[in-house]
């Protein structure tokens, strides 16, 4: 059997695979904020990015390595293809971390070998020991992945895994790259690897999966029963296509059904020892932070973190819950950090009080960003009688979007009504500090604002999505706006909140435009799709 650390290790790849979701690109400050929250959550490994992809990705991984973790914190991991330039860039980026890992991979399925890598099995068998050994020359902790393992020939897969372990790999990852496999098949695959790889006892067995058939979490739980001891997942299940296995669902399944899973770890069913090191009370906070910063809205009926996850509409259910919550609830909402607590901050509250609450919510702002957030808080306090944590999260989340801001919104004025043509006057401050104003008509107030902004910024794009939701209850609630725009096939999202949804829409659109402009001219390399941009000798 594979090496057993005595519990399930949680490998979070929100900042790498999760960020590959269309429109979910994050800037350096946003990535750092998420990494700091992941450390509070208690994940074992943070895959901080793909350093070779771009200078921006390298800088973000390096910043996280410098600022997150510590001797008692998570391992900081970087992804690299089986290529010396990739591996060297990864090693340099993660170098500042006290605990670091290089995660390198190569495809093993015949379809990938023939159509993507254009290599033979023998060539792959030659590459694996060279690249794992090269990674091992930089760090003690090396993870090796067999890309598309779920569709690979088993005998060849066993051979590759054995070779990777003998070359120094500490963790072997088995990805279901295209979300194709079913739970029973995945369980059998993990069991077969345990039974047919002679040196598997020298490495931890890990799994990585996508949700194309909606089976990622079920697949992982079956893998755990058969010896997998590291789960690679993302907050809110974000990721390419249909997403990745959702961290919060995996954690709570192992938490709520501990008595079922305990025997697979050699424990008695009643053992109270947690199966992971994750602090479940940080789950909701982590989910909201990732949703706010990526602009990817969590579906209301999403398990564990959706708005309806703990809601009861049926009269029969409501009656049962009022008598005893266990009648219809298997999870106490407080276990995942969900509460309706109001923050006792008002007009006379100081910056230190606001900073303390923000830190509790997972935000660590610098002085300038704190001042901006505090100003917005005071403005909101003048307009709202009660301010909730959700309000505070909404008004502060866009502060970490500003470091790359090339356009700043200064003024929005709208005139509209039943007998008026919607008209917007907008003033924007450019990178050079020059103010420009435009007036535009539209089919509605938001359309007029967007047209005015387009005439000022001159950044062609296609508006793909516009959504508004209320942050809290009440007529004075903040309106949270998410906007997605597209240029050249790439999606960029913007997010903002205000009691005036037109103002929120204008700021969200500006935030999306800033992401678009910042990304223009510095396209990142995709770790699985872009092979031409690497020295072929190293693959």
Curated annotation (Swiss-Prot):
What family is reported? Belongs to the alpha-IPM synthase/homocitrate synthase family. LeuA type 1 subfamily.
- Matching CDD domains, A to Z? DRE_TIM_IPMS
Q: Where is region (Regulatory domain) located?
A: 408-539
Q: Which GO terms describe its biological process?
A: L-leucine biosynthetic process
Recorded hits in InterPro entries, A to Z, give: 2-IPM_HCS-like (IPR050073), 2-isopropylmalate_synth_dimer (IPR013709), AIPM/Hcit_synth_CS (IPR002034), Aldolase_TIM (IPR013785), LeuA/HCS_post-cat (IPR054691), LeuA_allosteric_dom_sf (IPR036230), LeuA_bact_synth (IPR005671), PYR_CT (IPR000891)
Protein name in the entry: 2-isopropylmalate synthase
Citing just one GO molecular function, the answer is: 2-isopropylmalate synthase activity
What is the organism of origin for this protein?
A: Prochlorococcus marinus (strain NATL1A)
Superkingdom of source: Bacteria
Q: Where is the Pyruvate carboxyltransferase domain?
A: 8-269
Q: What Enzyme Commission number(s) does the record list for this chain?
A: 2.3.3.13
Keyword tags: Amino-acid biosynthesis, Branched-chain amino acid biosynthesis, Cytoplasm, Leucine biosynthesis, Manganese, Metal-binding, Transferase
